A protein has these predicted regions:
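Sec-dependent N-terminal signal peptides
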Residues: 4-13
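Short coil/linker segments at helix-helix boundaries
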Residues: 29-60, 64-67, 78-119
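Bacterial Sec signal peptide processing site at the extreme N-terminus
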Residues: 13-38
Length: 119
C-alpha cells in the first residue's frame, strides 16, 4: 500500500512539472502580444509600473522551461529595453541588474541555438 501511495505521489509531481513546461512553451505568442501592448502603452508611468510584473511572469515561464529559446529571446529583449527606457537615468544599480539578466538570457539562448558559439 505504501508503494502505491509513493507511485501516485511521484506521478502527480511529474504531471505537474510536465504541464508547467507545456504552459510555458505555449506562452510565446501571448508574451509577444503582451510585449507589443507594453511597447505601445501611451503612459510611460503605467508602462514603468507594469514592466516588472511582466518580466517576473516571463521569469516564471523560464523556470518551467529554461531551454526555451523563444522565451529566452523575449527575456533578453524585455529586460534590456526596460533598463534602457526606464532605469538608466534614474536607478543605475537596478538597470545593471536588468542588463545582466537580459544578457544572461540572450547568451543562454544563443548557446542553445548555436552550440559551438561559446567556444
Amino acid at each position: 500500500m505504501n508503494r502505491l501511495w509513493l507511485l501516485v505521489c511521484v506521478l502527480v509531481s511529474m504531471s505537474s512539472c510536465i504541464s508547467s513546461k507545456m504552459i510555458a512553451n505555449n506562452m510565446v505568442g501571448s508574451m509577444d502580444d503582451m510585449k507589443t501592448s507594453f511597447f505601445a502603452e501611451e503612459s510611460p508611468t503605467y508602462a514603468r509600473q507594469a514592466g516588472p510584473a511582466l518580466m517576473k511572469m516571463l521569469d516564471g515561464f523560464l523556470v518551467s522551461s529554461p531551454e526555451n529559446v523563444a522565451l529566452l529571446s523575449r527575456g533578453a529583449e524585455m529586460n534590456c529595453a526596460f533598463a534602457q527606457t526606464f532605469l538608466d537615468d534614474h536607478d543605475r544599480t537596478w538597470a545593471q541588474v536588468m542588463y545582466k539578466r537580459g544578457k544572461g538570457y540572450g547568451m543562454k539562448g544563443l548557446s542553445l541555438e548555436y552550440p559551438g558559439l561559446a567556444k
